[in-house]
Amino acid sequence: DLKFTKLLIDEITKNNSDIAVGSRLHRKSKVYDRTLMREFTSRAYNLLIHVIFPFPGFKDAQCGFEAISKNIRKNLLHKIKDNEWFFDTELLLLSKKYGYRISEIPVIWKDDPDTRVKVISTAIKDIKGLLRVRLNF
């Protein structure tokens, strides 16, 4: 829901965050119509991130709802290699690596039953991305 955009911007401007992200795993979030497979896949991916990066500083790597400060835009975006589904994860991991402050806000999330995400190929690309980032951490 785009009305939450103001909450993201407020996290940056009023709470001194460098990046604010929506999190479906925030305790105050509401998630609707999520299939068991999508929930499992999402939780497994986030668990894998925590295994590879024990200190990530965020719970939900791919909500896809974020706002960044001018500082991140200027100093970090050019370091991100991925321009597909792994972009969000890479943005968060590099933000943590370089000491930027990450804030998560709750969201109201309704799953799209008509999603065109190819789970297997996306998962393979994401795992490769995680390994690439880990090797350069």
Where in this protein do the model-derived segments appear?
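Short, surface-exposed, polar/charged, turn-prone segments marking secondary-structure boundaries
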Residues: 46-50, 94-95, 130-135
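Residue-level signature of catalytic and energy-coupling elements of molecular machines
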Residues: 20, 69, 95, 105, ...
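Alpha-helical elements of Rossmann-like donor-binding domains used by nucleotide-donor carbohydrate transfer enzymes
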Residues: 7, 47, 90, 126-129
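Acceptor/aglycone-binding surface of glycosyltransferases and processive sugar-polymer synthases
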Residues: 2-83, 112-121
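Catalytic donor-sugar/metal-binding loop of nucleotide-sugar-dependent glycosyltransferases
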Residues: 56-57, 79-83, 92-110
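C-terminal catalytic/acceptor-binding lobe
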Residues: 98-137
